[in-house]
């Protein structure tokens, strides 16, 4: 399972998940991807379960990229422990996910859209956040449609 080799501080604050993902929200390596639709924490166990589900379905067909890494420690106190006496010990690691973040990518010569969609569907069941399947050509069409609109907005202002 994934976890950092070493960290500067073992115990972290929980934090808040606001806004959308500004980084890691485009397909970078493969042709198909699984994109988060809501915010949440994904544990290293859930990432591993999703990875196994996808690799078992595609067998040796293509390549899978994991685009998230669990770098936040979650601490827990022992059961039936009184309040006080400090923060609990780190129990597991999570990746903080915001809407729009690409979680997994898939590509390769043998990977068809149908195979990729089914493999990603199996991975979706293992995750605690809503996700959607996207393809590289869909993303390029969407960004091409947004580019002229942004250019018109600049022309109107000047």
Curated annotation (Swiss-Prot):
The keyword Ribosomal protein applies. Gene3D superfamilies: Ribosomal protein L10e/L16. Disulfide bonds: none annotated. GO terms for cellular component: ribonucleoprotein complex; ribosome. One of its GO terms (molecular function) is structural constituent of ribosome. Keywords: Ribonucleoprotein, Ribosomal protein, RNA-binding, rRNA-binding, tRNA-binding. It holds the Pfam family Ribosomal_L16. InterPro entries: Ribosomal_uL16, Ribosomal_uL16_bact-type, Ribosomal_uL16_CS, Ribosomal_uL16_dom, Ribosomal_uL16_sf. GO terms for biological process: translation. Part of the 50S ribosomal subunit. PANTHER family: 50S/60S RIBOSOMAL PROTEIN L16, LARGE RIBOSOMAL SUBUNIT PROTEIN UL16M. Belongs to the universal ribosomal protein uL16 family. Binds 23S rRNA and is also seen to make contacts with the A and possibly P site tRNAs. HAMAP family: Ribosomal_uL16. This is Large ribosomal subunit protein uL16. The lineage of its organism: Bacteria, Bacillati, Cyanobacteriota, Cyanophyceae, Synechococcales.
């Amino acid at each position: 399972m994934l976890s950092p080799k070493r960290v500067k501080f073992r115990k972290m604050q929980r934090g808040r998940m606001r806004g959308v993902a500004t980084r890691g929200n485009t397909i970078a390596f493969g042709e198909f991807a699984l994109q988060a639709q809501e915010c949440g924490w994904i544990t290293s166990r859930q990432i591993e379960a999703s990875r196994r589900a996808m690799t078992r379905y595609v067998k040796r067909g293509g390549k899978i990229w994991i685009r998230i890494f669990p770098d936040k420690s979650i601490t827990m106190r022992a059961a039936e422990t009184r309040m006080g006496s400090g923060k609990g010990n780190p129990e597991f690691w999570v990746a903080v996910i915001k809407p729009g973040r690409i979680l997994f990518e898939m590509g390769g010569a043998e990977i068809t859209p149908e195979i990729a969609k089914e493999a990603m569907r199996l991975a979706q069941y293992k995750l605690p956040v809503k996700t959607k399947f996207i393809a590289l050509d869909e993303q390029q069409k969407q960004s091409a449609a947004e580019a002229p609109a942004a250019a018109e907005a600049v022309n109107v202002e000047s």
